[in-house]
Structure formats: structure tokens, C-alpha cells
């Protein structure tokens, strides 16, 4: 007998005013190819970017643990990101990830194109393609679909599963407002 897990445990989900939320008209198939294989759930509030084939992918983001100068080849980011080797972050390709520190991960990257301030949120370059936030947590089983938000107000940013870069916020447009 096969039992399918129905509810995630210990997962951070985004919080917003549900009455103000408008979902997109249909579901989108999630491209799971660049997500960690051990990831079982896509959290409510994850930023979703549209791909050319019509699928959506998570727009990966990370918050800088400390400042990095232009041309740096190492970048420290807070834990909890989805980046992997060969991904791009802030325009630079990741060649290695050191996870040995309890507070941050150290990314070895090609030369950083621009400086990164402490606590700056960096993305994978797909921020302009973001079409919404994941409306509800979904189980990732290979062909899962999700529904992005079209509008949401009073978003409590600190509850989102991943930090949002300024570029992601611009892509979300004025139909997504954050709680002050």
C-alpha cells in the first residue's frame, strides 16, 4: 500500500490578506529540474517565473550574509536558499557551495559583476519573468501544477519562504503590496 504525504511539516509559508488575493486563471506546471531532488514541497509565497515553454520555475533568491566587493569570487549568503552548483546568482555562475558553517553558505562564483551589500537580496536573473507568488503549498511529485497570485495585499514579507529582491518586487507590480 502506498501512502502519500498530504501535509508538510515545519514549512514556512507566506502570509497575506486572503480576501485581497486574486489567483491567476489556470494552473501552471512546475519545472522541477533545477530544484534540489530532496525538496518535497513548494511553499506558499515562493516567487514563480514564467519560462518560454509555459511552465513556471522558482526564481531563486538569497540574502547576502556579508558585503562582497565587485569582482569577488566568494559570496556568503544566509542558509535557506535553493541555489546549486552551476546556477547563476547576481550574474555570476556558482562553481562550489560550502555548507560547513551553521550561519551561512559560502558560494564560490565567477567574478561578481557588481558589489553586494550586507543583507542585499540577490536573484538568479529571472526576476523580470516573475508572474506571481505561489498561492498554496504543493507537493512536488514530478508533474505538479501550481497557481500563481495575480494580486495580493498586506504581504508579510518576513513570512515568505525566500527573500524577494527589488527586481522581483518590481515584476510583481503594484498589484502586490507589502505590509508596512
Regions found by a protein language model. Name each.
Residues 1-180:
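Surface-exposed, low-hydrophobicity beta-strand/loop segments enriched in small/polar/acidic residues
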Amino acid at each position: 500500500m502506498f501512502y502519500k504525504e498530504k501535509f508538510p511539516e515545519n514549512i514556512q509559508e507566506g502570509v497575506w490578506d486572503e480576501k485581497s488575493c486574486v489567483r491567476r486563471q489556470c494552473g501552471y506546471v512546475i519545472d522541477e529540474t533545477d530544484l534540489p531532488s530532496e525538496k518535497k514541497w513548494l511553499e506558499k509565497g515562493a516567487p514563480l517565473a514564467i519560462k518560454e515553454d509555459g511552465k513556471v520555475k522558482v526564481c531563486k533568491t538569497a540574502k547576502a550574509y556579508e558585503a562582497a566587493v565587485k569582482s569577488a569570487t566568494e559570496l556568503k549568503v544566509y542558509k535557506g536558499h535553493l541555489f546549486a552548483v552551476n546556477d547563476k546568482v547576481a550574474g555570476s555562475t556558482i562553481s562550489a557551495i560550502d555548507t560547513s558553517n551553521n550561519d551561512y553558505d559560502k558560494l564560490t562564483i565567477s567574478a561578481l559583476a557588481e558589489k553586494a551589500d550586507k543583507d542585499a537580496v540577490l536573484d538568479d536573473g529571472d526576476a523580470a519573468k516573475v508572474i506571481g507568488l505561489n498561492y498554496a503549498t504543493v507537493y512536488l511529485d514530478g508533474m505538479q501544477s501550481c497557481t500563481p497570485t495575480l494580486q495580493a495585499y498586506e504581504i508579510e514579507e518576513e513570512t515568505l519562504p525566500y527573500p524577494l529582491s527589488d527586481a522581483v518586487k518590481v515584476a510583481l507590480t503594484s498589484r502586490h503590496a507589502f505590509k508596512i
